[in-house]
Regions:
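Cap/lid segment of the alpha/beta-hydrolase catalytic domain
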Residues: 34-43, 47-51, 58-81, 119-127, ...
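N-terminal cap/lid segment of alpha/beta-hydrolase-fold proteins
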Residues: 1-23
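Catalytic His-Asp charge-relay segment
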Residues: 156-167, 179, 190-192
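C-terminal catalytic histidine-bearing segment of alpha/beta-hydrolase fold enzymes
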Residues: 188-286
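Primarily recognizes the serine-hydrolase "nucleophile elbow" in alpha/beta-hydrolase
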Residues: 37-39, 78-156, 166-169, 173
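Short alpha-helix in the alpha/beta-hydrolase fold that links the catalytic acid
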Residues: 171-181, 206
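Short beta-strand element of the alpha/beta-hydrolase
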Residues: 14, 24-33
C-alpha cells in the first residue's frame, strides 16, 4: 500500500442492517464474491447474525466502479481495491454510534473471503487504517489462497477458514498450507472442511454445475514478499517484471478455465451454524 489510492477515491455502497433494540452492537462486514452483491447474502447471513444481536454491513465494491462481476476477469477490480473497501467499511461502522468499534468482524465468500483473509495482516492494517484499529474476527468462506503472504504478520484477531472438500476453484489444500504458515507466525487461526461441498455451497444456486468461464489458479503458489512483490514459487515469475508479463506467465504455467459451483444444503446449514457460533463467541459474548 503506497497511498496512491487516496488520489482517486471511489464512492462504494453498502447494506446496513441492525438488530432490534438499542445500544452499541457488535457488527460484521460481509464482502461478496466475484458475482457481487446478491439478496441471499442478506436473507441467509445477515439475518442470522442480526438475530443474535450482531449488526451487518454488506459491501458493494462493484456498482460504484461500473462493474457487475469479476469472475471472468479478476483484474477488473483489483484485489487491493477490495481490501481497501473492507477497511473503509470497518472505519465507517466504527464511526456509527450504534456500533461497538472494538467488536467488528469480517466475513466474505471466495474473492470476499480473500478480503477477510488479507485484512488480518498487520502490515496492511497499519498501512491503510493505522495502528489503533483492526477487525476483531475473520471468517473467510472458501477464499482463494493461490496468492498469500510468504511471511504472514497476523494481527491478534482470531480467524476461522471454511472450505469445501470438492472445491476445484479455490481448493482447500492451498488454504491449509497458508493456515499452517499463519499458525507458525502466531495467528489464532483454525479451519474446517465440509464434506462433499463444492465452491459456492452457501449460495442460492441449488444445483452444482460446471462453469467453463471461471479463471482458475488452483495449481499456483504465488507469494507476496515483504516488499509487496508477488512471485510464483514454481516458475519464478514475478510482478517485478511488470504486471502484464507476470499474469501472462502464471496463466501459461498454472492457470486454467472452468470449475464447479453450486450449493450444498448440508454444508450450508452446518457452516451457517459455525458462523453464528464463531461470531457469537468472538464478538457477542458478554
Amino acid at each position: 500500500m503506497n497511498g496512491k489510492y487516496l488520489q482517486a477515491p471511489v464512492d462504494i455502497f453498502g447494506y446496513l442492517a441492525l438488530p432490534k433494540g438499542q445500544g452499541k452492537f457488535p457488527a460484521v462486514v460481509i464482502i461478496p464474491g466475484s458475482g457481487g452483491y446478491q439478496q441471499w447474502m442478506q436473507d441467509t447471513l445477515a439475518n442470522r447474525l442480526n438475530e443474535i444481536g450482531i449488526g451487518t454491513l454488506i459491501v458493494d465494491s462493484f456498482t460504484g466502479r461500473g462493474v457487475s462481476e469479476t469472475a471472468t476477469n479478476q483484474a477488473t477490480v483489483p484485489m487491493a481495491a477490495s481490501v481497501i473497501d473492507g477497511f473503509a467499511a470497518l472505519q465507517a461502522l466504527a464511526e456509527r454510534p450504534e456500533i461497538d468499534a472494538s467488536k467488528i468482524g469480517v466475513t466474505g465468500f471466495s474473492r470476499g473471503g480473500v478480503v477477510s483473509m488479507f485484512t488480518q495482516d498487520r502490515r496492511l492494517v497499519d498501512a491503510t487504517i493505522g495502528k489503533n484499529m483492526q477487525f476483531a474476527a475473520h471468517l473467510p468462506f472458501y477464499p482463494g489462497c493461490a496468492t498469500t503472504f510468504d511471511k504472514p504478520a497476523p494481527t491478534s484477531a482470531p480467524a476461522l477458514f471454511l472450505m469445501g472438500e470438492k472445491d476445484d476453484y479455490t481448493p482447500a489444500s492451498q488454504c491449509l498450507s497458508y493456515v499452517a504458515r499463519l499458525k507458525s507466525a502466531g495467528a489464532q487461526v483454525s479451519s474446517k472442511i465440509y464434506s462433499g461441498a463444492y465452491h459456492g455451497w452457501i449460495s442460492d444456486v441449488k444445483q452444482v454445475t460446471y462453469v467453463p468461464r471461471l479463471q482458475v489458479y488452483s495449481q499456483c503458489d504465488l507469494r507476496i514478499n515483504d516488499s509487496g512483490l508477488i512471485r510464483d514459487i514454481n516458475s519464478g515469475a514475478s510482478t517485478a517484471d511488470g504486471w502484464g508479463s507476470f499474469v501472462a506467465a502464471i496463466w501459461k504455467k498454472c492457470g486454467k478455465s472452468g470449475a464447479h459451483y453450486g450449493a450444498n444444503e448440508s454444508a450450508k446449514k452446518e457452516s451457517l451454524t459455525d458462523m453464528v457460533t464463531f461470531f457469537g463467541e468472538t464478538l457477542a459474548k458478554k
